[in-house]
């Protein structure tokens, strides 16, 4: 491992708090994520959703640099990856930590994969003439919130790839995704909450 990633004996606790990302990587954690933003969960199906505003840098194959772990090696068009996406992680029990000890929880993310992905604007799309990502798909998701009652994942954008940031509603039961709100130019959709029965 590179010299700058060594931890002096007895300083593990300090390292864990002073530079959690690097120390986690030394311990085997995946550290290549770029622009990881909102997190929410679906308790009925035991799924965790994570907004990845941009997919670049260490997440892309052969772009990891000197990081001690290289768990993520995505391939694909950089213009598509630049539009970000929502990742989904099933949660389950029976998982071990990096020391081989059983984690005493049934809510451990065991794997993660792309779920709802943005993509570059297709040639000939006339809607959203200033958008660089497909106007009919999410772009650079930032804030997310899951509603158990509605079985719906709400996704707020913070994107320079859509002129207007959108709020999307994705039904996890039927897979339908609809745009429900367009913010004014430069307006970020943040602080998402679901308040049933108003």
Where are these regions (language model features)?
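Conserved small-residue
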Residues: 1-198
